[in-house]
Amino acid sequence: MAKGSGKVLAQNKKAGHDYFIEDTIEAGMVLTGTEIKSIRAGKAQLKDSYVRITNGEAWISNMHVSPFDQGNRFNHDPLRARKLLLHKKQIGELVGAVKRDGYTIVPLKMYIKDGYAKLLIGVGKGKKDYDKRNDMRKKEAKREMERTFKSKNQY
C-alpha cells in the first residue's frame, strides 16, 4: 500500500497552502482507547497542529481529538501532546531538515492503515505571500482553461 493511502480521517488542507512540502514521512501514534474511537468516528482536526522534536522523540501538539461520547470518566484531554512512532534514523532526518533555514514539520493527514492510525507528516518551507498569490493565479488560469475546453467540446 502506498504511503498516505488508507481511509483518510483528517486532513490539513492549509498546510499545502502555507508550505512548500518537500518530503513526507509516515508515522504511527501513541493513543488511548477513547482517542482511537473518536478518531475512527472522524472527530479529529489537524488544523493548527505541529510536530516538535524533544529529547530524540517526535511529538504532535495542538491536534484536537474530541472526547469520545461514551467515554465518561476515562476520556482524554482533547489537546494533549501525542507521541509519534518513528525510527531514530527518521527522527535524525527530521532534525536535520528543521535545522535548515525556514523548514518546519507539519502534519498533512491522518488515516487508518491495516487497522492502525497513521499520520503523514511533511517537511516544508513556509510560503511568502507572493508565492501564495502566484499559486492562486496558476490555479485560476488552469480552471479558466478547463472551462474554455469544456465549453468548446459541447456542441
From Swiss-Prot:
Under CDD domains, the record lists:
SmpB
Example GO molecular function: RNA binding
Q: Where is the composition biased (Basic and acidic residues)?
A: 127-149
Q: Does the keyword Hydrolase apply?
A: no
Report the superkingdom from the record.
Bacteria
Q: Name one GO biological process term.
A: trans-translation
Region of interest: Disordered: 127-155
Q: Does the keyword RNA-binding apply?
A: yes
Which InterPro entries does this chain map to? SmpB, SsrA-bd_prot, SsrA-bd_prot_CS
UniProt keywords, alphabetically: Cytoplasm, RNA-binding
Where does the protein end up?
A: Cytoplasm
Q: Which Pfam families match?
A: SmpB
User: One cellular component GO annotation, for this chain's record?
Assistant: cytosol
Q: What does the similarity note say?
A: Belongs to the SmpB family.
Q: Which HAMAP family match?
A: SmpB
Record function comment:
Required for rescue of stalled ribosomes mediated by trans-translation. Binds to transfer-messenger RNA (tmRNA), required for stable association of tmRNA with ribosomes. tmRNA and SmpB together mimic tRNA shape, replacing the anticodon stem-loop with SmpB. tmRNA is encoded by the ssrA gene; the 2 termini fold to resemble tRNA(Ala) and it encodes a 'tag peptide', a short internal open reading frame. During trans-translation Ala-aminoacylated tmRNA acts like a tRNA, entering the A-site of stalled ribosomes, displacing the stalled mRNA.
What this protein is called in its record is SsrA-binding protein
Q: Which lineage?
A: Bacteria, Bacillati, Bacillota, Bacilli, Bacillales
